[in-house]
């Protein structure tokens, strides 16, 4: 509701939203290809109509694609190439590894192979970010991250609700830690900043609202912490996050999902402009686009009947 009202206010003044936030301090935003490979695992790939990833060689090829399209970073999840390639995500649902949330040695070994394949594909310059989600507890995160700490990753991303536990993990590692995408409001973030729990604070702009997100970014700056938006949604969210990133000084990098349904661009009147892995700051008034109601109506939500079958995750 807040973001809709801010859009209306900006439109009434004939300005982009970022002008209401103090103006843009940059004209384009570096992007990282989020969930890289996740949506190309067999079950999801079929829904999107793209060739499925079934081997480490496929990850090498995907890494080359990321590099060739100009992105400066990618973020991946935990994949297991077993009977059927799938995501390992015990922190989200009743699946393998839940509820104990303890990493097995085979998971760590598989992760090393996965990250090595991506590194071979992207080359030495691009950043690789690893999202561990809610998949472990403090001990498990430490076990996994220590085993991967010498790989030169851009960050480990993880979610914990205890700021002291997250701070303990961060101070035990060389690799930066990103977190807090699931937090809401200034008061939710404050104890994590006070505990020096993360290097990069991930802020969800649609969920928090643009004004609250700006306050969180301001508080982060006072603790010398960079900010990155949580943006695995659609184009409207991407544009909201772009205005946010344009206006804050302590911006790190912006998340975006590249693999998606082929009609995604049809849902808005003006999709985000991406060139060589960079997002151009929207120039139109308000958020810079409008919803295409006809296109939305043409693609209603479908109940596939398997929404609660989490045994093999997204794969």
Question: What is each stretch, according to the model?
Answer:
Residues 1-127, 135-142, 147-150, 266-315:
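N-terminal capping/lid subdomain adjacent to the active-site entrance of alpha/beta enzymes
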Residues 2, 7, 75, 131, ...:
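Acidic active-site catalytic centers that drive phospho-/nucleotidyl reactions
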Residues 48, 130, 202:
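Generic anion/oxyanion-binding catalytic loop in active/binding sites
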Residues 76, 128-132, 179, 229:
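Conserved hydrophobic beta-strand within the GNAT/NAT acetyltransferase core sheet
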Residues 80-86, 102-108, 128-139, 155-163, ...:
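Short, small-residue-enriched loops and turns at beta-alpha junctions
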Residues 146-155, 161-290:
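Shared catalytic-loop signature of beta/alpha-barrel
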């Amino acid at each position: 509701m807040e973001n809709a009202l801010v859009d209306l206010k900006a439109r009434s003044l004939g300005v982009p939203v970022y002008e209401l936030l103090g103006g843009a301090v940059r004209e384009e935003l570096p992007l990282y290809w989020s969930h890289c490979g996740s949506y190309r695992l067999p079950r999801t790939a079929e829904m999107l109509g793209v060739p499925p990833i079934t081997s480490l060689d496929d990850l090498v090829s995907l890494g080359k694609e990321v590099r060739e399209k100009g992105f400066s970073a990618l973020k991946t999840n935990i994949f297991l190439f077993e009977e059927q390639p799938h995501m390992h995500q015990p922190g989200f649902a009743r699946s393998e590894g839940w509820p104990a949330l303890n990493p097995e040695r085979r998971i760590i070994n598989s992760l090393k192979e996965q990250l090595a394949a991506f590194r071979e594909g992207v080359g030495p310059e691009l950043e690789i970010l690893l999202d561990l989600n809610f998949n472990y507890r403090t001990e498990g995160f430490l076990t996994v991250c220590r085993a991967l700490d010498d790989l030169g990753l851009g960050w480990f991303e993880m979610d914990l609700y205890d700021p002291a536990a997250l701070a303990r993990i961060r101070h035990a590692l060389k690799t930066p830690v990103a977190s807090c995408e699931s937090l809401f409001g200034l008061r939710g973030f404050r104890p994590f900043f006070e505990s020096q729990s993360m290097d990069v604070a991930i802020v969800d702009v649609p969920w928090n609202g643009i004004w609250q997100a700006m306050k969180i970014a301001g508080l982060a700056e006072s603790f010398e912490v960079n900010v990155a938006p949580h943006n695995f949604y659609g184009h409207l969210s991407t544009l909201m996050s772009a205005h946010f990133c344009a206006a804050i000084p302590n911006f790190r990098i912006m998340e975006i999902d590249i693999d998606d349904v082929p009609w995604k661009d049809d849902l808005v009147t003006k999709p985000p402009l991406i060139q060589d892995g960079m997002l151009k700051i929207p120039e139109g008034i308000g958020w810079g686009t409008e919803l295409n109601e006809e296109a939305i109506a043409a693609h209603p939500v479908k109940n596939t009947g398997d929404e609660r079958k989490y045994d093999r995750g997204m794969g």
